[in-house]
Each structure stands twice: as structure tokens, then as C-alpha cells.
Amino acid sequence: MCSLFGLIDFKECLSTHTKNKILNTLARECQVRGTDATGIAYNFNDRLRIYKRPLPARKMKIHIPHGVNVVMGHTRMTTQGNAQFNQNNHPFLGKVDGSSFALAHNGVLWNDKELRMEENLPMTSVETDSYVAVQLLEQQKTLDFDSLKTMAEKVDGSFVFTVLDKDNSIWFVVGDNPLCVMFYDGFLIYASTQEILCKTLKKLRLKAPIDILEPQEGEIMRINRNGRITTGTFTPHTTFEHWWRKYPFYRSYYEDTPASYDDLFSVAKAFGVTADEVQALLDYGCSEEEIEEMLYDPELFHEMTGELLYAY
């Protein structure tokens, strides 16, 4: 479980200070979905810049230079690939036709190893499943609706991809994970969930947006630096394994023993965490492994569960 976030100041109406404030607030609110690493990508002086560190957003000060109007970000909860090796963190750098792009992913891909063999993709030291999306785009030597469609239809898993290109457009490739974009008069912000954006607005004391967009599964959306939107579609690659992972509660019909979280509750109790807090995260969709990892950061754990239990 990770989070995507970012902004496009398409009328160049925000000061650099305001953009940095928005980005830092967004990133910190995104910690609810990942604290292992934080990263951003933007274009500056005709070069794509990626800044990422194996740190939670609250410990990493995001600072973009004057003149940057498009920023793509990511907060990570590790599923594959050690976050301490920074190459495994998002966004990732890719190149097509001599131009650089940055890609970030929220979700889990299950056929990355198979794709590397089937597509004869080059060996890489990057250990994450997400990086196969970069390689599939590089293989096609172009970045457009067709290449993104091809990539999205080859990967199997849960995903939303964001891609920042050299022209300062952000591409959104929406699978079965959430995404929300809020529009204002002159700029937009986005994150993986509307809840994250609402909490960000509250902390920044921003007014209600003039429009909210939540793209659906199978949509590809490009928003350029002027705020113009163009769209395309793809057919999600769905397999029985994907369905089985997405709807694990169906397993209870076939397993002799229903899932029990007694061990998890006992471990949590040793950390001073109540069963209600653990259950709130389970209901939210966190796995046992994710919850056990979060137990080692009690301050963040209680902050997250507090928001889930007492959300306004």
C-alpha cells in the first residue's frame, strides 16, 4: 500500500513557497499509506530531476526550485525490494527515444518476473515489481497512449501508475486502485484517495475545489502543463489469481479454518496497541505483515488508527 501525490500549477498562480507547503502537507498526509520512502520528480532547466530517500515524509523536507510548476510524488510502503537501497524507491527514471521520464506506482504487480522472461527485458539491479512497467515502456521506445495501453494490458496486479514526461505532462494509468484529482482555478492537486486530499485541504485551509475527478479502472488520462486533459482507455489484464488476491474473503468458503488474528492482536498488545486499532487497519485493507511493520513506529500507528476510528 503506497500513495501517489502531486500538483500542476497550470496558470502559474502559486508562489514557490505555497507549492512547497502544499507538497509537504500532501506528502505527510500520504504517510497513512506508506512511510518507508518518499520521493518526487519534476523538470527543471530542461532536465528531469528525481529526489527520493528511504525516509517517511515527515522526516524529508520537500523543496522545489523557483519556476517548477509540475511535480509528481510518491510515499512507499515496501512490498518488494529493500527501501534502504534507494534504487528501489519511487519515482523511477526511464528513457524513451532519448528523453527521460519518471514513473511511480501504487499497487502490487504479480507477473513481473514472468514478464521479464517473456519479454526478454534487460537485467536490472532494481528489485521492485513496479520497475517492470518502466522496462516495458522503454522497450517500446515511445511514451504515448498506445505504449501505456500496451504496458497496462501486460501487467497483472493492482495499480495506478503516474508518469511525468519531458513536456511536463503527467499521465495517469488507472487500474483497480483509487485516485482522486481536485481542481482549483489555476492549479490541481492529486492523491491516491479523496480522504487524503480532504485532510490536506483542511490543514492548508483551502476552500472546496471547483471540480473533483476520480478516474475509473481502464482509463488513461494525460494532463499537460496547461491543465488540458486528454484521455484513452485500456482493457485490464485480469486473471483468476488477480481475482483471488483482490477478494481474499472468498477463501473462507474453501478453507477448513477461518483466518484468525489472535496472534496479531497479542503482538499488538505488547506494543500497547488495542485490538480495536488493529481491527480498524484490517478493515481498511492492511495486511497482517503491513500492520506488524507499522507497530515499530507507534506514533504513526496511533495517528493512522486515530484518523480511521475518529474520522470526521
Task: Give short role names for the model-derived ranges.
Residues 1-312:
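Conserved short alpha-helical segments that host acidic/polar catalytic motifs at enzyme active sites
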